[in-house]
């Protein structure tokens, strides 16, 4: 049986010793895909054309966590004082989402990835989350999700 190829969105950071930019993904994503019988492929940040090629190569897409989603993508000005944005990553991953939907490839998302998917589907985000913390066990990270009535997601 052919193993599914799973694209994992990469992030970037500067190597602390020599200012070389590195592409990476958290090892847990890579190991999780392997443990589930898939072949993990880290997708480094690229352009919109590259997004089309990547989606053609993979069977499924995982949108990982990371920086804030730039509010300009959901029609708002920045209202918080933060430099934790990556414009090129937003543009690239929005192109991945668009192409994955076009090619009917499943999309899984975590944290920022879920936020970006929401924005790609026309949603908005709370920028200032200080008043939106939820009480929960430290063993689990959760966020409440409001779903629309009579939708597949509500049924799940």
In which residue ranges do the predicted regions lie?
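N-terminal beta1-alpha1 cap of cysteine-dependent amidohydrolase-like domains
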Residues: 1-110, 119-121, 126, 130-156
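The feature captures the ABC ATPase H-loop/switch
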Residues: 114
């Amino acid at each position: 049986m052919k193993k599914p190829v799973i694209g994992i969105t990469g992030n970037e950071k500067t190597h602390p010793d020599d200012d070389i930019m590195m592409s990476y993904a958290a090892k847990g994503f890579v190991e999780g895909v392997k443990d589930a019988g898939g072949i993990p492929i880290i997708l480094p940040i690229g352009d919109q054309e590259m997004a089309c090629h990547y989606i053609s190569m993979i069977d499924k897409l995982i949108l990982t966590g990371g920086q804030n989603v730039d509010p300009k993508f959901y029609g708002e000005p920045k209202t918080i004082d933060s430099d934790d944005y990556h414009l090129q990553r937003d543009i690239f991953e929005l192109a991945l989402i668009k192409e994955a939907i076009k090619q009917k490839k499943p999309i899984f998302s975590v944290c920022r990835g879920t936020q970006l998917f929401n924005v790609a589907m026309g949603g908005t985000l709370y920028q200032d989350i200080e008043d939106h913390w939820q009480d929960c066990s430290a063993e689990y990270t959760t966020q409440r999700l409001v779903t629309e009535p009579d939708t597949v997601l509500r049924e799940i």
